[in-house]
């Protein structure tokens, strides 16, 4: 999914890296070394990022949610998403005796990454999702047993907005 939703970034990186790689064959001396270094400066961080992402998202147990186990089942679960909800359906199925309240703070004017727009087309939001503002959550104080914000809070880029969000939680 990372490549699928961020393909533009990887395409530009591949083109840039390939450009410097192939140009380096027509050069000599310091210019050849510089082109090779530029190629590596693009390829190594992007390749490392992809390998780390593969390990975290695909090879690890992160998406099997074995780490999300409760000795006492929560009565009310709030699941927070930011335009891309991969977990509400799993939570609803796994904790069917709990009441799930999925909320989504995605705001197209604030959260402008094209990858989220692409993800929303592939993964529709949970049908019970409540659209909210990250600064004004419609939850009563102490009304939930568990809040899950799995891979969503990092989408709040503004520091003040992030602080306000955590205060709301």
Where are these regions (language model features)?
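Class I SAM-dependent methyltransferase Rossmann-like catalytic core
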Residues: 1-72
